[in-house]
Amino acid sequence: MHALQAKILDPRIGNEFPLPAYATTGSAGLDLRAMLKEDTLLEPGQTLLIPTGLSIYIGDPGLAALILPRSGLGHKHGIVLGNLVGLIDSDYQGELMVSCWNRGHTAFNIAVGERIAQLVLVPVVQAHFELVEAFDESQRGAGGFGHSGSH
């Protein structure tokens, strides 16, 4: 398990609400909570930037974090991330914020402390461009959308 530096920015974390933790030994994501001042109604089509009350510092340029939606919120209520996925670079040290978008047809109440997203650490490979006149031939070539089959 990799050590991750974290700062609690909202004193309710660790007291009223638990620190992010893996739910099972096979869990990939840590749940992030809505550390709002009060319950908030998210209307259909509305987007809201929600504080998590937590900042992290990954430090290792070989790692990054992704903020991903919780599957149940999207499937059952139409609550997804406004930016679809959040990328946290290894040198970022500010508060983790979650952009929530209600793509559903009914208003959704976000309760204080509700689990709204999940944080997943991922490996990073940085690349540099090697400019070429032509690519080595491949089986796929430049075939794009739908090229590898109809379904």
UniProtKB/Swiss-Prot annotation:
Keyword Hydrolase belongs to the record: yes
Annotated GO MF terms: dUTP diphosphatase activity; magnesium ion binding
Cross-referenced InterPro entries: dUTPase (IPR008181), dUTPase-like (IPR029054), dUTPase-like_sf (IPR036157), dUTPase_trimeric (IPR033704)
Key words of the record: Hydrolase, Magnesium, Metal-binding, Nucleotide metabolism
Superkingdom field: Bacteria
Keyword Magnesium assigned: yes
Cofactor: Mg(2+)
Catalytic activity: dUTP + H2O = dUMP + diphosphate + H(+)
HAMAP family in the cross-refs: dUTPase_bact (MF_00116)
Protein known as: Deoxyuridine 5'-triphosphate nucleotidohydrolase
Organism encoding this protein: Pseudomonas syringae pv. syringae (strain B728a)
Gene behind the chain: dut
